[in-house]
Amino acid sequence: MSYTKDNDKLYRYLFQNRAVRGEWVRLNDTFTETLNTHQYPKAVQNLLGEMLVATSLLTAIMKFEGTITVQIQGDGPLKLAVVNGNEKQQLRALARTQAEIADNASLSEMIGNGVLVISIMPNDGERYQGVIALDKPTIRECLEDYFIRSEQLQTHLVIRTGEYEGKAVAGGLLLQIMPDGTGTPEDFEHLMTLAETVKDEELFGLEAEELLFRLYHEEQVEVYPPQETEFHCGCSRGRSGNAILLLPMEEIDEMLAEKNGVIDMQCECCGTQYFFDKNAIMEFKQEADKLNQLGL
């Protein structure tokens, strides 16, 4: 893919004379690294790309330190799809299938009867969870409905996934009326109509400044400094070792015997493998016992 300085970047911007705010994001390596360790069907890849874009945009518009999880659950061939993001624009994604999925499968064909769950978990403050029926054709439309119901703010999303110069890419735009109530439906409708004219090659190939000029050259747009996005799993040897300790020691010993003295743990998200023999497990247990004694 030809390099532009705005690959894997998120921009925020404000229409000064319209009381509407916007965001633009393009996920290049962030998206491809999510897919590298999995052989997802094409339709699932595209859905995860849409969810990554949506999570990035949501995380940026909700100003807090913490994490957002966007999760789809259903009874169709796609059992689960989940994306996590935080205020640093660190993103990860995972999907689980339970039957074959055609490359051109629609959302309803993949999910069956399902829900979209958005969990907002600030580092300081109360956790919030919203559950939305997946009763619309696209994730974009379901999320727009979520904003109307939960935030009571008119919001418009453009979310695209595909290939650009031979590599997977995902990108999107968000428009939202400012919460101060000074924005008008006419202003919002005007900007929304302009946003819908964006072409895939513009969304995936142009730098932010040029893209925004093409779409909004007659508007007064204040663009803020960008934020980098990245794939970040967050797994570690320590977390995997502590997960093993959730099992009774008798069961751990049985697993060691069955696996020739070494238990291997593979991260479902990034594919990293961690190996533990009896000595390593006992070291984790001793450390856990010390923390328990200290009441930590």
UniProtKB/Swiss-Prot annotation:
GO MF annotations, alphabetized: protein folding chaperone; unfolded protein binding
Keyword Zinc: yes
Record PTM: Under oxidizing conditions two disulfide bonds are formed involving the reactive cysteines. Under reducing conditions zinc is bound to the reactive cysteines and the protein is inactive.
GO BP: protein refolding
Subcellular location: Cytoplasm
Major localisation: cytoplasm
Key word Transcription present: no
Residue pairs linked by disulfide bridges in the UniProt entry: C233-C235, C267-C270
Keywords: Chaperone, Cytoplasm, Disulfide bond, Redox-active center, Stress response, Zinc
Matches recorded under InterPro entries: Heat_shock_Hsp33, Heat_shock_Hsp33_C, Heat_shock_Hsp33_N, Hsp33_helix_hairpin_bin_dom_sf
GO CC annotation terms, alphabetical: cytoplasm
Domain of life: Bacteria
Physiological role: Redox regulated molecular chaperone. Protects both thermally unfolding and oxidatively damaged proteins from irreversible aggregation. Plays an important role in the bacterial defense system toward oxidative stress.
Family the UniProt entry places it in: Belongs to the HSP33 family.
HAMAP family: HslO
Name of protein: 33 kDa chaperonin
